[in-house]
From Swiss-Prot:
Its main location: secreted. Expressed by the venom gland. It comes from Agelena orientalis (Funnel-web spider). SUPFAM superfamilies: omega toxin-like (SSF57059). This is U2-agatoxin-Ao1n. The presence of a 'disulfide through disulfide knot' structurally defines this protein as a knottin. Disulfide bonds join C37-C53, C44-C58, C52-C68.
């Protein structure tokens, strides 16, 4: 019985610690990890994902053409 209670307490503590870490903090990548950005021509880098370095959103105009929009 003590083992079950101890296991439940340990599980609760682990869950609490995991829940305390913000999701976004673990998901955000630096510009280098995203593959860099191309702010000079306001095009989205294919490796940078859906976001642009300047905080603008990436709109896909076609498969090969995406632009950063406000």
């Amino acid at each position: 019985m003590r083992a079950i209670i101890s296991l439940l307490l340990i599980s609760a503590m682990v869950f609490y610690i995991i829940a305390a870490v913000p999701e976004e903090e673990g998901l955000q990548l630096s510009e280098d990890e995203r593959g860099g950005c191309l702010p000079h021509n306001r095009f989205c880098n294919a490796l940078s994902g859906p976001r642009c370095c300047s905080g603008l959103r990436c709109k896909e105009l076609s498969i090969r053409d995406s632009r950063c929009l406000g």
